[in-house]
Amino acid sequence: MDFQIGTVKKTQGQVKKHASHFTHKEVEQVYNARERVKDLWLKRGIKIGFHLQDKIRNGETKFSYEMTMKTMLNSTIVEYNETGADKRILLRSHYSKNKEVQCIVVSLISGKVITSYLNKVDDVHKTLDPRRYDKNLKINLPKHLTK
């Protein structure tokens, strides 16, 4: 196994919007921003944030750059979140290994992978708590992030 199976955690100071509540304009924004991050990765490589570095160092997870790039190239955006001033997306891979798919949280500002975990392929989140999401959150990314 390349990654730890994910557990749902609530993060202080974080607001989230599930992709099912995105407007058409918001869908365009987050997918364009993802393309920008992908281009950054292709030019300078994948960078990982301190949180993920700590998880790797502490043995909480393993990390694969190859699997992370596959996720960037072939995934669905599951949610958008704002944590402090950072704007992030959660990507769920279409590529499965051992009946698991990789999920990564990527900063749209820095391009770094914030965290990474695995989900079962058949996990359709029937137990997902809708109270963790704000369907009224307005996604309004700066133009330089969506070009």
Task: Give the residues covered by each predicted segment.
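Ribonuclease/tRNase effector modules and their secretory precursors
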Residues: 1-147
